[in-house]
Swiss-Prot record:
Extracellular side: 44-828
GO molecular function, one term: growth factor binding
Biased composition (Polar residues): 1027-1062, 1081-1092
Annotated motif Box 1 motif, positions: 864-872
Key words, A-Z: Cell membrane, Disulfide bond, Glycoprotein, Membrane, Phosphoprotein, Receptor, Repeat, Secreted, Signal, Transmembrane, Transmembrane helix
Location of Phosphoserine modifications: S922, S1039
Protein name: Leukemia inhibitory factor receptor
Cysteine pairs bridged by disulfides in the record: C53-C63, C80-C88, C208-C265, C336-C346, C461-C506
UniProt-annotated glycosylation sites, renumbered to this chain: 164, 199, 238, 261, 385, 402, 421, 440, 453, 476, 567, 647, 658, 675, 724, 782
Function: Signal-transducing molecule. May have a common pathway with IL6ST. The soluble form inhibits the biological activity of LIF by blocking its binding to receptors on target cells.
Motif WSXWS motif per record, residues: 514-518
Amino acid sequence: MAAYSWWRQPSWMVDNKRSRMTPNLPWLLSALTLLHLTMHANGLKRGVQDLKCTTNNMRVWDCTWPAPLGVSPGTVKDICIKDRFHSCHPLETTNVKIPALSPGDHEVTINYLNGFQSKFTLNEKDVSLIPETPEILDLSADFFTSSLLLKWNDRGSALPHPSNATWEIKVLQNPRTEPVALVLLNTMLSGKDTVQHWNWTSDLPLQCATHSVSIRWHIDSPHFSGYKEWSDWSPLKNISWIRNTETNVFPQDKVVLAGSNMTICCMSPTKVLSGQIGNTLRPLIHLYGQTVAIHILNIPVSENSGTNIIFITDDDVYGTVVFAGYPPDVPQKLSCETHDLKEIICSWNPGRITGLVGPRNTEYTLFESISGKSAVFHRIEGLTNETYRLGVQMHPGQEIHNFTLTGRNPLGQAQSAVVINVTERVAPHDPTSLKVKDINSTVVTFSWYLPGNFTKINLLCQIEICKANSKKEVRNATIRGAEDSTYHVAVDKLNPYTAYTFRVRCSSKTFWKWSRWSDEKRHLTTEATPSKGPDTWREWSSDGKNLIVYWKPLPINEANGKILSYNVSCSLNEETQSVLEIFDPQHRAEIQLSKNDYIISVVARNSAGSSPPSKIASMEIPNDDITVEQAVGLGNRIFLTWRHDPNMTCDYVIKWCNSSRSEPCLLDWRKVPSNSTETVIESDQFQPGVRYNFYLYGCTNQGYQLLRSIIGYVEELAPIVAPNFTVEDTSADSILVKWDDIPVEELRGFLRGYLFYFQKGERDTPKTRSLEPHHSDIKLKNITDISQKTLRIADLQGKTSYHLVLRAYTHGGLGPEKSMFVVTKENSVGLIIAILIPVAVAVIVGVVTSILCYRKREWIKETFYPDIPNPENCKALQFQKSVCEGSNALKTLEMNPCTPNNVEVLESRSIVPKIEDTEIISPVAERPGERSEVDPENHVVVSYCPPIIEEEITNPAADEVGGASQVVYIDVQSMYQPQAKAEEEQDVDPVVVAGYKPQMRLPISPAVEDTAAEDEEGKTAGYRPQANVNTWNLVSPDSPRSTDSNNEVVSFGSPCSINSRQFLIPPKDEDSPKSNGGGWSFTNFFQNKPND
């Protein structure tokens, strides 16, 4: 927008003041003028910005603006719109209503009385479309369904063009201020006033609270480009329930959708303590005062009696019943048909069970739109999901019918439709009143009654014919329809004297469905003459004088009636010799005839007449080239084959009988055509395990001739008895057994062989109670030659018990076993050999032993009986009498205290074998300090009691030896010397080699040593003492004198003293050489000594 203004002053005002102007007056006037213009311009600018135009019908714009600064609102003169007819409109205030302007910019000028002007540029885009506040015409409530129905006028006539309207509806529940429902609803304004409706169902029963509704709307017109805004909310419209009953719980007997949520309230004068659905407690919701509610989520399908809801107060109990279920399902498989073209029956499946019964059950209405006829079906019995049926009477002459089936219950409705041509949907009723009338023995008339008006269609009927032991036969018949009529059909090709069962069903010729089968009608046709003669056979008696004639009863389809008797005649050269009448049920005749060739005739007779004769020759052509064959069948049948014989012109006859029966053997026979070469004999009389004889006869002009003779079984079984066998002969190494044949009746099959088991065993031992072939110690013999009746078992042991078992077998299996225990005879030659061999071996061993003992007698004597030396001849105990006897100073048995010294025994490296050192353990404890200085591997510290010697020896070397308290053994020589080689004997000291080496050598002078050597050299053959006798002390080493002696040279003791430390007998040494001449060995037993 653009605006401008100006200010003019009257000239008289200028003239009056001109005389009073001072020099500063022009400047002051200019400043005031500029200030006035600035303030006016700001006021005009604000007025342009605050101009607002609205419209509520797009026909008239309502514009308002604030007056400029310094201008009174009442000084508006007019408003002018440029380029518009009647462009100026007088005004008195700052508000004007002008007709809607065309799209585009328009210049608007506002003139004031004081001369001011305001100019604006106005466009439709700057105008706001704000509809008038809507008015609610009516608000009603359905308290049973808790529904509100709202009505209002949309005022569509006020708008110049059709427009879309959006309505916003707000529902409040007192005392709550928040809306419980806020819904948008779209409608079309058509240019005329229309009353709009809106329905809303409350979760809370309307009885429980006051409900208020308010609406507003919004217009969306494509012909208006300005702003579109919501109208103001309409005034609230309230609705409340006026309590006129004593009911306290709402809703009452409500029908709800299963799985939905619902709220139930209780308006009680006293405090409500609890609320529950069924037996389940629910939390209470306080609404206002004493009014409470409970909320139920996902309510299940109710039982037939509904679901109980109870509120308990201090002094009473209140409640209601809720019925939860489903709306009707769409009717399924809707089909319509007619049974009699008078009434149409429609059937359907109701689908899902609604769960509602009684007055809330689904009601079905079948409406035919062409005729306008309808029928109602209301099932109240139960909840079964069965097929429903509903009938509608047909309109005469109407064939096309359009049916609509509607199902309704309190929760909703569903529909299904079908269009049919009724003449193509005919399923007649069941035929009734069946009748059968004979025309002759093979043709009858069958009739039935069928209700219905079928004059315009043809009927297709099926007649089912059934006779005993035969397949059912169905015949079709097309019949011209009639109204409630009896229909007749001729049934031919029947058998005489046969019981039949008839029944019928019908449909239309175009076929929709068959009717159900009628009841059965039984009928027996009349008799006729037999169509064939009896099947005949003959056998000569065992004495050959009488001919026995056999015949089989005629089957029903050939007898054509009840056979009363049979006429049997024989003729010779076409002259009848005799005639016999045999009454039924006898089927054999015996005639005495000669050996001539007679022709036997048999004729069957019933009430209608006689059959053609059956003829058979009495003579049989002999055949000597006959061999007996074997055959095995399967189940209750046996298969026989033969070669074609061109000489056979009539037929073949197979006769069979039980082989155990006496002659004449006849069980049954069968005739087959002459061109056949095989047949299967089957009979219910065949039994498994029974042998039958089969005879094949061929027929020629001269008579019958036996062609083959066969024995066989229809099924082989195992024998029922074991072969009876005995022992014929027994030897030391063999047994001969013999057995008998098994009777045919007990064999029950063709004998294939015998199984013979045997093993060692005694009677009544667990091992031999039964023999199994898989045991390794059991021997088996399979005898396949059935003519063999003996068996010799060889390679047996003498005088041994054997267990023998014999079993027969066929293809049907093994028969039972027959067992026997047999002991073989004793073998005399073996017994003699068993005695002689041990005797001979004993004699040989005795002779060899005697020879060896004689040759080794000296060695045996030395080994087992050595010479025991006489102790009196031992010089080891012969001592010098001067030493051991006659001295009072020698106290041999005197016990004196002994102070032990430690003796270290060191191992010396000797070139000769040594005696193993012996460790002597002292009773005195060892000193740890002294032991640590000596290597434990090279020496042993022992306790030693040195004897005290009073004799003094002046050898200075002895001071070192005798004065030490520790005595060290360097070596202990054995009393036996090692064997020296020949070349080494010259270098050995004769004294050392000749005799015993003492344990210790006492120091002596050279002169004494030489003298001693000479003396010892001559005494090498005798015993050498262990010590020098000259050094022996005559007193006990433990005597006080010996203890106090200062003599440092001492002896180890005397052999006569109990305190001696000398080794009289050397210990065993593993390293010492062993003697090779003595001792026991097996090789020495066979060697001779040099002196032997």
